[in-house]
């Protein structure tokens, strides 16, 4: 996280990083009339949440169920996105798969 913070501060020293989602960081996003902000892969963020939920429930990595995925998506949409609404907040991208 420190290396990402140092790197992004070269573009925007006030950029906010999404805590706990270091593995989902993909770069920066430019917006007109705004400073660049941190960009994260939304699907990877959901995978991080699933891993966290598995750990809390003592599940094996191979175990996947649709309910757990649904809980992670719901938590992301209802909690994570709401935490990052101010200036310099990160953006979460859905990547195009060719």
Where are the model-predicted features located?
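C-terminal alpha-helical interaction appendages
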Residues: 1-98
């Amino acid at each position: 996280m420190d290396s990402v913070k140092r790197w992004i501060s070269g573009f925007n020293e006030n950029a906010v990083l999404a805590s706990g989602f270091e593995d989902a960081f993909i770069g920066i996003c430019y917006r007109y009339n705004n400073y660049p902000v941190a960009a994260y892969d939304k699907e990877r963020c959901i995978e991080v949440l699933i891993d966290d939920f598995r750990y809390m429930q003592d599940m094996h990595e191979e175990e996947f169920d649709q309910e757990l995925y649904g809980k992670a998506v719901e938590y992301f949409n209802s909690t994570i996105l709401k935490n990052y609404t101010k200036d310099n907040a990160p953006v979460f991208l859905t990547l195009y798969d060719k």
